[in-house]
Amino acid sequence: MDLFEYQAKELFAKHNVPTTPGRVTESAEDAKAIAEEIGKPVMVKAQVKVGGRGKAGGVKYAATPEDALTHAQNILGLDIKGHIVKKLLVAEASDIAEEYYISFLLDRANRTYLAMCSVEGGMEIEEVAATKPERLAKVPVDAVKGVDEAFAREIAEKGHLPAEVLDAAAVTIAKLWEVFVKEDATLVEVNPLVRTPDDQILALDGKVTLDANADFRQPGHAEFEDKDATDPLELKAKENDLNYVKLDGAVGIIGNGAGLVMSTLDVVAYAGEKHGGVKPANFLDIGGGASAEVMAAGLDVILNDSQVKSVFVNVFGGITACDAVANGIVKALEILGDEANKPLVVRLDGNNVEEGRRILSEANHPLVIQADTMDSGADKAAELANK
């Protein structure tokens, strides 16, 4: 889960990472009031989960509360790379002597953690990596040893931070590592990490991505979920513990196992080339259990997608046998009743497939069309979606 900047800074404050005071608001008048309360020049910052806010006009300096009001009025509702600004962070402006970059992330290729540090902060880190790679340090982090202040100082030194700030930077970097580990993050990034004229080290910005797989031990993270920004179908799927990702096609997909579902997406996309360019509408993995309740929940999500014209159910029976899957489909259609109003192409294979096909045949549901193979099922689903 990606966090807004203000949420990242809430975690920073929790772990004593120094930053600038401020508050979030959805109102231009409140932005003015916050600026008056701070009593100093402020930054008015769009809260969107995408980079490039400054270039898009989403970050403005306000010398007075009236300036904050004007900037807030202009920024709210702004479209930044497809993200509409609904919230603003009004934070005390800071004098900046130098800007640095620091992040902790997963290094999946090497199966470890990675610290990245650079004296070239305040600009896109991809640009630094491309134009000044020698100025960007990439330091592997031992998962057991972690990052204490001594190792944090090494990271800062390798990032070419000035000698006079190494000790102060090390304290903040070690605290950012604490955020990364204790909050189960997959990314903690500060750009810029700044030195002020009086040699304070402050995290002026913050980007944090939390690992959803750790939600069971991080109950407090639920408050960070932005339901307004989450697709309602994805939200419904999550409430039913379904692995669902909405796409932009017309063929709804249900399968058991991520690998099979990914293959199904490819086969449907290929078949769709013959039927007007039809594409998959979603990724939906129901996992190992295809009970009536699970199948009904999956179909309920997909059938509520107005873009879906047909559904392809592609299941390989393993631990869950095909007869159980077939019974699940039949009962799911009973549960949904009139809400099930789009054709379902069903391909079953694997454990007890003949019994599963018999159950579907005897049910004789008008919406269900059986397919013998994945290719024929994908072709039929694409054909139906193109009608």
UniProtKB/Swiss-Prot annotation:
The keyword Magnesium applies. Gene3D superfamilies: ATP-grasp fold, A domain (3.30.1490.20), ATP-grasp fold, B domain (3.30.470.20), Succinyl-CoA synthetase domains (3.40.50.261). It catalyses: succinate + ATP + CoA = succinyl-CoA + ADP + phosphate; GTP + succinate + CoA = succinyl-CoA + GDP + phosphate. Its cofactor is Mg(2+). Residues 9-236 form the ATP-grasp domain. GO terms for cellular component: cytosol; succinate-CoA ligase complex. Substrate binds at residues 256, 318-320. Binds 1 Mg(2+) ion per subunit. SUPFAM superfamilies: Glutathione synthetase ATP-binding domain-like (SSF56059), Succinyl-CoA synthetase domains (SSF52210). This is Succinate--CoA ligase [ADP-forming] subunit beta. It comes from Mycolicibacterium vanbaalenii (strain DSM 7251 / JCM 13017 / BCRC 16820 / KCTC 9966 / NRRL B-24157 / PYR-1) (Mycobacterium vanbaalenii). The gene is sucC.
